[in-house]
């Protein structure tokens, strides 16, 4: 149990205004000190067990209702929560970079990254970075067993800096036929042009972002929106909060 609280009259008035008793507040503080139990999962969600699947006819009906809503002047805005940082995705890569071992353990996340390095959408950008920073291609670094240099080029500031970027800024999907890749932000824009364009021909997008990353999103949107407008033949208006 955490040490007993000392509450002022103002504290007591404040918690009382929120419907919280001193005893309840102490219980909450104790919980923060002792931690929370893990949830017990009863199984995976599947169709018929937590997931509802629409039939082909129901899908068509839903699409028709949506299209009719838009045709009748209904307002649509694609809302995208985009404040998530990518740092947790790269936890095992940071651990390897900071660790004593220079070779990733067989079967580890880092080994899987190295084994599949050419399959990532960001591989061309990574290869450019390693040629600039190390004067070697990624594949040459693999041959030289310079695995930490490769990982550093992915997650640190001297490379792609993915360990410090929001998830929305990572090159995520590859489009070989177009010779490009898309970030999640660009995919959200593309999805919006297919699903949420108003009869006026305008797509409204709203992204919630971390204040620390706002400038990054503004720059990406300024770059991505004109290309998406030309591709889809629509006007795109985006806002951030």
Residue ranges and their predicted role:
Residues 4-47:
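N-terminal regions that are enriched for targeting/export leaders
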Residues 15, 37, 41-89, 94-241:
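Domain-scale recognition of functional cores that engage charged ligands
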């Amino acid at each position: 149990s955490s040490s007993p609280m000392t509450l002022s009259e103002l504290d007591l008035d404040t918690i009382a205004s929120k419907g919280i008793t001193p005893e309840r507040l102490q219980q909450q503080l104790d919980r923060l000190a002792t931690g929370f139990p893990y949830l017990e999962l009863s199984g995976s969600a599947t169709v018929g067990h937590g997931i509802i699947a629409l039939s082909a006819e129901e899908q068509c009906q839903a699409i028709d209702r949506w299209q009719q809503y838009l045709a009748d002047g209904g307002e649509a805005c694609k809302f995208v929560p985009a404040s998530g940082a990518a740092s947790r995705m790269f936890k095992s890569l940071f651990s390897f970079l900071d660790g004593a071992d220079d070779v990733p353990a067989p079967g580890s996340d880092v080994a899987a990254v190295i084994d599949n390095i050419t399959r990532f959408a960001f591989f061309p950008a990574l290869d450019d970075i390693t040629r600039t920073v190390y004067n070697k291609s990624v594949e040459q670094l693999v041959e030289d067993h310079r695995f930490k240099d490769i990982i550093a080029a992915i997650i640190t500031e001297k490379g792609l800096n993915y360990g410090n970027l929001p998830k929305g800024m990572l090159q995520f999907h590859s489009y070989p036929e177009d010779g490009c890749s898309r970030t999640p932000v660009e995919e959200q824009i593309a999805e919006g042009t297919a699903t949420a364009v108003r009869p006026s021909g305008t797509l409204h997008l709203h992204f919630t972002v971390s204040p620390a990353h706002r400038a990054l999103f503004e720059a990406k949107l300024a770059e991505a929106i004109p290309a998406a407008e030309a591709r889809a033949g629509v006007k795109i208006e985006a806002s951030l909060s």
